[in-house]
Amino acid sequence: MTIPLTRCQFIIPFAAICDAIGAPTEALLTKFRLPASLEEKPEHYIPILLAVRFAEAAQRSQGITDIGFQAARQLQFFHLSEKLRAIIRFSPTLFIALQQLCKWASLEDTTVSVWLERNDHHVRICSKVAGTARMPHLEHSQWLQNVYTMQIVRQFTGPHWVPATMAFEARYEPSLETRSFWQNTRFISDQNSSWIDIPVSFLDLPNPASETPAPSHDDGVGPSGHEIVSAVKLMLPSYLDERIPTIAEIAEMAGISIRSFQRKLSSAGVSYSDLLDGARFENATKLLRDTDAKIIDVAFSSGYSDPAHFTRAFRRFFGVTPREFRGKWKPQ
């Protein structure tokens, strides 16, 4: 059986809460066989079971109310793994970002599954950690799961958005004090998974990061990696239904060598194929949701000469066929 693991980064806020009130943090960590030097190992992994036991022991022994919530309050987007941040940053829409989250969530917790469920005019972003079905006090972990998902959504909505509903797999009721921080959010527990919901209309939200690229640390002259990424993302949709430029042609347009072009993309955390896939699937999902275009026409419009190849690639990326996607996501 696989041991469920989580990044040390997610236990650091719990330790910081203990430190702030003068608790014997190091002794508690050692008791549960966790590394005392967590801040030196944010990208390392530890067993979720031990992390949850540590959090519960700290809460109980120190009289802390809702330590999971207190830890989640400290969680920001930049605490996610570098690779997941890059993937989200360069997703053109929230929907693509959430699909990528479903694919790459195990970067944060090794046995977590994330998926989307349509529920009337809302979409639930669900998460569940395999191998933890009978584990007590999972609410501490599930607070982090729900809030880091919320932080991803906020990259598209702005920093003040909160979900209308937050659900916990654990049998757990937030305290009145905790609820006072979430006056516009309904809490439910004992669910099949943990989840937050977003309006279906949010799925088309564009990524503001595309318009305001982060500062680059590239050496040398010429456009930075982030400038290159922004330009390519703007340009590719124009070519999808014609001849898509090769990587050599894109490099020539940018006035740099292929090697420099690839190095700049790498510094931004993406590859040319990542950008091309993103443009293709953004175009395809928009057509499938918003029009009645035939699947074959969606394939051609998205840069595929073979509709069967399009269907296979779409299913590999999204986990459903284009036809199934349309039936599930197109507004009724």
Task: Please provide the spans of the model-predicted regions.
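N-terminal low-complexity or simple alpha-helical regulatory segments
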Residues: M1-R124
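Internal, well-ordered alpha-helical segments in soluble enzyme and binding-protein domains
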Residues: A97, Q145-Y148, I228
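Short hinge/gating elements
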Residues: E82-I87, G131-M135, P215-D219
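Extended mid-to-C-terminal alpha-helical interaction segments
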Residues: Y172-Q332
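DNA-contacting interfaces and partner/effector-binding or oligomerization modules
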Residues: S113-F202
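Short, contiguous, pocket-lining structural segments
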Residues: T6, A20, H137, S141, ...
